[in-house]
């Protein structure tokens, strides 16, 4: 009998990258609301080739499991030469510190979106852009990556 799993990208990345038992990410209602506002503002300022809140899903078959993975990429930048998944992160801590401490989680999440987009559009290579925005300062930092399907 085939076992079926339905997972969000968030659930998958949390499970795969879980280490220890302390989660040092900062979550509170005020910070989350401000993050939502910053995401929407940032997305509204992007060019017409920027697809905000892009819904993705893919089915994977592993052993006797059917896994449906789904999630919503913050943005997809559609270019002729390279599609780029934009993952936006807002924080109240130093951007370099935040990136260094959370890079594996952020890249893992973006890689899932990139793979699903590549499968949907039959692409061999997809770019990833991690966009970090400070919630109280006017600071932004961008990290770029390129991945190919293997």
Predicted region positions:
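Mg2+/Mn2+-dependent nuclease catalytic core
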Residues: 60-150
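Metal-dependent nuclease catalytic cores that hydrolyze phosphodiester bonds in DNA/RNA
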Residues: 1-82, 108
């Amino acid at each position: 009998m085939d076992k079926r799993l339905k997972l969000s990208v968030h659930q998958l990345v949390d499970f795969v990258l879980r280490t220890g038992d302390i989660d040092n990410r900062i979550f509170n209602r005020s910070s989350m609301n401000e993050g939502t506002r910053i995401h929407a503002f940032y997305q509204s300022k992007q060019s017409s080739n920027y697809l905000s809140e892009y819904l993705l899903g893919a089915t994977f078959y592993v052993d006797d499991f059917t896994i449906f993975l789904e999630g919503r990429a913050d943005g997809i930048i559609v270019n002729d030469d390279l599609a780029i998944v934009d993952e936006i992160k807002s924080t109240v801590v130093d951007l370099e510190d935040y990136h260094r401490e959370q890079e594996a989680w952020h890249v893992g999440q973006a890689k899932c979106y990139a793979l699903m987009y590549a499968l949907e559009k039959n692409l061999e290579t997809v770019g990833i852009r991690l966009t970090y925005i400070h919630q109280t300062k006017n600071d932004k930092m961008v990290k770029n990556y390129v991945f190919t399907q293997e």
